[in-house]
Amino acid sequence: MKTRYVNALCYRGGEFAAGSLLVEDGRFAADAPAAAADRTVDLGGLHVVPGLVDVHVHLREPGFPHKETIATGTAAAARGGYTTVCSMPNLDPAPDTPDHLRVQTDLIRRDAVVRVVPYASITLGQRGCGELVDFAALAPEVVGFSDDGRGVQSAELMEEAMRRAAAVGKPIVAHCEVDCLLRGGYIHDGGYCRTHGHKGICSESEWRQVERDIALAEKTGCQYHVCHVSTRESVELVRQAKARGLRVSCETAPHYLLLCDEDLQEEGRFKMNPPLRSRADRDALLAGIADGTIDV
């Protein structure tokens, strides 16, 4: 069956332009205005884009199905136009051996409605310390290696992880957080925190590890990606790394672009890690989006 979709704004060649699409038996086909179609659908000026990719999702299965499952998470992804998602390894068991990874990939094959590519953990048990996983054994089935939710605390351990990741052609995807700088904090160490007597999380707890890891990436030649940057210092470090030609990228999240710690005054439920930072940090993130420093 052939269906032509008309009156669409199609994303082609880096921009949106008016056009139409021909779908034949569920697949896009070369469209010619004169080609016959079994039916025509007027999209009324809707935007049409290729399938989107989310490089940082938490499907939480196996281990935590009360939080999310592969079935529910991928259904939500499909609803939003995402056809590929990369699943973080905060699971039980953590995907730190081929057998543990297989528990997840079996569920993916059974339940996923979009393409799911998993991350393996960097350390056994995804602890951010201790022993590294077998990178070579896990590499064929994963998009990269991450201990997301925990920073790898030892520079020596991270350097060896980067060497092993580089050897198998996979990126290190890092949650950057220096544990000894957290000091029991739970919101950003800024004006709101001090005014109301809360325990704060300093910006240095993030950017200090970003700084360390970029130096290690330069030393090892590893491709390196920083998860959910939240501070202006992190943005500037990534900007400088890119200017030096390093294979460094980063992401942020919508709440860090829309909100800051001042918004805690009106809504105390805004608790996440990393925390909402200052207005100056938010502005730096927006500038990083605008100039291409922040990739995702």
Each model region followed by its residue ranges:
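N-terminal metal-binding scaffold of metallo-dependent hydrolase/deaminase domains
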Residues: 1-36
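Divalent metal-coordination and catalytic microenvironments
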Residues: 8, 21, 26, 45, ...
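Active-site metal-binding motif and surrounding structural segment of the metallo-beta-lactamase
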Residues: 34-48
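Histidine/acidic residue-rich metal-binding segments in metalloenzymes
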Residues: 130-296
